[in-house]
Amino acid sequence: NKKIDRTRIAKNPVGMVCKELQADVHLVYVEESYVKKFTDIINKVGLDVDRIYLNPYTSAKGTLDGEAWKLGVIYVDIGYASTSVTIVKKEKVLYARVIPLGETHYITDLMSRFNISESDSAEIIKKLKNKEFEADATIRCGTKKILLKDVKDIISARTEDIVQYIKDTIEISSFNEIFQKGIVLSGGTIEIEGVYEQIANSFNYKVRRIEPIPLKGLSNPSYSDAVV
């Protein structure tokens, strides 16, 4: 928002005369040295970097349709190692926030709770995504079986952390009244049994899941950035 002399809201104040101009600004920044490491790697393989994009932006761009970009949506990408919340409206990114919380944390939770290896834990997550359960409501892990209920309790606890993060981000952003298209979920983690449903039931907004924009050879929502 832009205000002229503390009272008048102006979409485009260029050319107006006033004593004071106010604006709400959200800055997204990254350490220059951090970016340089990536550009150096790209340069070493003989490629040039033409432009650098904010990762949540590219993920949203590769997933959302034009209507969502115009009318306003909260785009949540729950990936393998991080979760990003991107608030867009009128084809602009109004707010973006990322935390290191994703599928890998579900894996480590299962490792800790059931004292199993990382590969066994990852296999359980895969079975949850594919709904590969035993007839007696267990999940086979190597030579032993684990109660499906116990696994889902672990998944639910970690999902609640993500739900709270989304709520906190919406509150901090102050953009909680402009989303005609509600919340859109993407990323490989929402394929885990129960994750999407728990998030959808935690908000008054309309919540839906979405696949990346159709592209031949791309079916996994984990790679939505690649279509941009």
Predicted regions located by residue number:
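Residue-level signature of catalytic and energy-coupling elements of molecular machines
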Residues: 42, 77, 110, 166, ...
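Short, ordered loop/turn segments at secondary-structure junctions
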Residues: 54-58, 90, 99, 211-216
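Phosphate/pyrophosphate-binding loops at sites that engage ATP/ADP/AMP, CoA/4′-phosphopantetheine
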Residues: 163, 167-182
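Glycine-rich phosphate-binding loops at beta-strand->alpha-helix junctions
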Residues: 178-202
